[in-house]
Amino acid sequence: MNKAIFLSDFNQNSTPRDPFVFYHDGYFYHLFAMNDALYLRRSAELEDLKDAKSKMVYHDDKFHEVWAPELHIINDKCYIYVAMDDGNNYNHRMYVLENNSNDPMVPYVLHGQIKEKNERWAIDGSILYHGGKMYFTWSGWEGLENVCQNIYIQEMSDPFTLIGERTMISTPEYEWEKRGCEGGNNRPYINEGPFAIYGKNKLHIVYSGSGSWSDDYCLGVITFEGGDILDKNNWKKHPTPILSRTETALGPGHASFFEDPRNGKKYFTYHLFDTDAKNGWQGTHAMIQEYEMVDDFPVLPKPVNHFIDK
């Protein structure tokens, strides 16, 4: 289970930030944002994904700071959920793209913004299913100030539309969720990158805590305990991170999870710093590793630095 697969770095004609990998119709796909555009690449074998040719599937000059895209196939059609702004971070919102196809490589067009009635800052949107309904989860601000990012959930009536009210289900509480943060000065407390994992009888959301600009970026998890999924009291936060730094693998975070249906193996992909945070977000790469569900809870191996942990 400890085998690590190198996915990408900034020398691979791709970006390692916020990696998203999925399997569909015989191929593994890697979706990423680079230079304010979205790209996909695919390969039949996971180990070959790093060398696959990239194809641009979306670009619009009016959007900037294009972050953390995810591709979800809903009713046999492909949708990309992505955070974008107009060049001002305060205007980051979630958008949905579509290509009217079940082929992920077909170019996408903008359907529109995922509109939440409070019109608050929003990034890192993802899809969650429970009880025959579809929900949207994301990282956002409670108010208008960049002091704290929380995890929210809200029901969807279709791939484009939120209904009802948003519910905050996680906010930074523990010391390990607040490292590198100030609660202001563009260093907000961080809960971001929510991603659902489905156990046999449990639903979990894995998220990232602490500053993504710090060596202490890590993964935490909240677990749905049953009842109303939109009641924050029905979500329980695990008191310790499930993935955190080692002496050589610093700042591991923003993960996505997927399965190889051919053999049932479970994988996650994440980014981390090449050396340390002093080189900023440019000095990062992405890895893929196997994980296990033990007693219906995600158990992740230690992160691996491709350039150091030989």
Q: What are these model-derived regions, one by one?
A:
Residues 1-310:
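Carbohydrate-active catalytic/glycan-binding domains of CAZyme proteins
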